[in-house]
């Protein structure tokens, strides 16, 4: 972190305290002594509640505890309403500290009658420590939360639409499954080395070579491999529907002839390794199922337009869209960058200004990870971003700064594409990918039935600008007709999908012709909420 010292002529630091203007106006209108503040500190079982006026004068001398059940929450509403009538309160605002998910039933109950504002735990901590250093109790927390609401630190949180809520749950379940599978593979690598030392190093991509895994699982030791001839290994692989070149098998047997001795618990390690293989296969099936659902949700939102960017695939676009949420929640692209924390921390005091610290903490880590995953793909597969990155490396930029700058740049591009529902004219789109083709190929390769895939493509076509529909349909037809086998789509499935293309093209063209400009502008995601699970 560099320190810049000057004569006070540097960039000034703005005071960024934001006051809740609407709340202050309501207080001025009726008076602070007639405006109530209810603060709630929730836990897993109970909610601690305290009530004051806007000047901080207690209405309840002591806090009250309510179990988080339906009946007790109704009692809490009645008690609060009675206190408002007894003390002549004309208005009330509720402050609830965010606690994962435990505060949600309380929030749903209270917001049916009063305005609810959320308080970040960091705010409670910062307002608690100066007044009560070294003391952390429910009562001290409630006092700090009361000061937070009065000072204007309560936030109005928008609830995600049901579509985005389900989409986000599916994406996070997939990420968790991928992480568990990754850790299991790392453990399996070590166990494999325990009973077959050095075998895993014979293959560059062990987990992408089913025949190598089958040999290790079936034989389980170098001595058994050495006692088996090459023809027998070939026949056993063929019986399992697998194949391996004879030179590779000979290389495996050569390793077995000179392999180190296994650990004393080699047989047990082999059994545990086989059990972990079953878990990895199960997680793989779960991940595939989640990715099918991601495809369905992506097709129903404008985020599907991001598939036109080389380097952005269905999974990364789906993860990005689920974490960003409705694009209408953002006034400008910098709001996405700020929510993800894609800017450096800063320390400034007098003439000392450390403006290039690490990325700020306390932001949405899931959104940041989704953006960074796309950045890694863009560096590998997008010519524009490859050149942009290489030029900065030549100028001596650190890789961290390059990645953050690329993430900011991508968020700006994505915002214009999604918010404007257009195929943005940008150098990174000089070799634009066909959106409908990329979506259809991914769906077919992941086992979604051809007819369901065509329904998804039809929904995705409704997100395209009218001027791009014709060229997208042509690219879809040409792409499926000349699709290489390396894409992973079975030949029979591909033929069935090609037979459905004429009816799909007619359906989309008819929808585009019958859709006027006003109808197109009013097109929303809501009509498709109920069909997502069916399409998935």
Range-by-range predicted roles:
Residues 1-536:
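A detector of single, family-specific signature residues
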């Amino acid at each position: 972190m560099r320190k810049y010292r000057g004569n006070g002529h540097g960039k000034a630091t703005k005071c960024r305290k934001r006051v809740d203007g609407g709340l202050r106006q309501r207080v001025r209108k009726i008076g602070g002594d007639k405006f109530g503040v209810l603060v709630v500190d929730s836990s897993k079982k109970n909610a601690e509640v305290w009530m004051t006026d806007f000047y901080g004068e207690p209405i309840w001398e002591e806090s009250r505890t309510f179990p988080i059940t339906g009946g007790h929450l109704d009692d809490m509403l009645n008690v609060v309403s009675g206190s408002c009538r007894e003390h002549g309160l004309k208005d009330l605002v509720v402050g609830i500290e965010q606690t994962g998910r435990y505060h949600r039933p309380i929030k749903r109950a209270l917001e049916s009658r009063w305005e609810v504002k959320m308080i970040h735990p960091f705010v409670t901590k910062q307002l608690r420590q100066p007044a009560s250093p070294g003391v952390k109790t429910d009562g001290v927390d409630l006092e700090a939360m009361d000061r937070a609401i009065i000072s204007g630190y309560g936030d109005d949180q928008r609830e995600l639409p049901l579509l985005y809520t389900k989409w986000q749950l599916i994406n996070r379940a997939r990420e968790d499954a991928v992480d568990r599978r990754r850790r299991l593979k790392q453990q399996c690598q070590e166990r494999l080395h325990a009973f077959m030392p050095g075998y895993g190093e014979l293959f560059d991509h062990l987990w992408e070579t089913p025949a190598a895994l089958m040999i290790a699982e079936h034989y389980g030791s170098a001595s058994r491999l050495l006692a088996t001839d090459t023809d027998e290994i070939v026949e056993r692989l063929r019986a399992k529907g697998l194949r391996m070149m004879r030179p590779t098998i000979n290389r495996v047997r050569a390793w077995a002839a000179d392999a180190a001795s296994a650990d004393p618990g080699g047989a047990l390690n082999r059994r545990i390794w086989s059990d972990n293989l079953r878990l990895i296969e199960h997680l793989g099936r779960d991940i595939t199922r989640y990715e099918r659902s991601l495809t369905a949700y992506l097709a129903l939102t404008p985020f599907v337009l991001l598939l036109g960017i080389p380097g952005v695939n269905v999974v990364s676009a789906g993860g990005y869209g689920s974490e960003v949420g409705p694009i209408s929640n953002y006034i400008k692209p910098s709001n996405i960058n700020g929510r993800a924390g894609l800017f450096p921390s800063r320390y400034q005091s007098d003439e000392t200004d450390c403006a290039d610290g690490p990325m700020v903490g306390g932001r949405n880590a899931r959104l940041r990870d989704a953006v960074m995953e796309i950045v890694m793909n863009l560096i590998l597969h997008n010519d524009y971003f490859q050149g942009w990155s290489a030029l900065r490396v030549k100028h001596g930029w650190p890789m961290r700064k390059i990645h953050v700058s690329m993430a900011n740049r991508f968020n700006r591009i994505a915002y214009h594409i999604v918010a404007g529902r257009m195929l943005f004219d940008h150098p990174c789109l000089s070799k634009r990918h066909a959106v409908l083709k990329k979506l259809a190929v991914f769906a077919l390769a992941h086992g979604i039935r051809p007819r369901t895939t065509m329904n998804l493509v039809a929904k995705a076509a409704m997100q395209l600008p009218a001027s791009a529909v014709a060229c997208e349909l042509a690219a879809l037809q040409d792409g499926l007709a000349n699709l290489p086998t390396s894409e992973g789509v079975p030949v029979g499935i591909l033929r069935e999908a090609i037979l459905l293309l004429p009816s799909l093209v007619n359906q989309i063209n008819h929808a585009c012709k019958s859709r006027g400009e006003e109808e197109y502008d009013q097109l929303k995601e809501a009509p498709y909420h109920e069909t997502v699970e069916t399409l998935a």
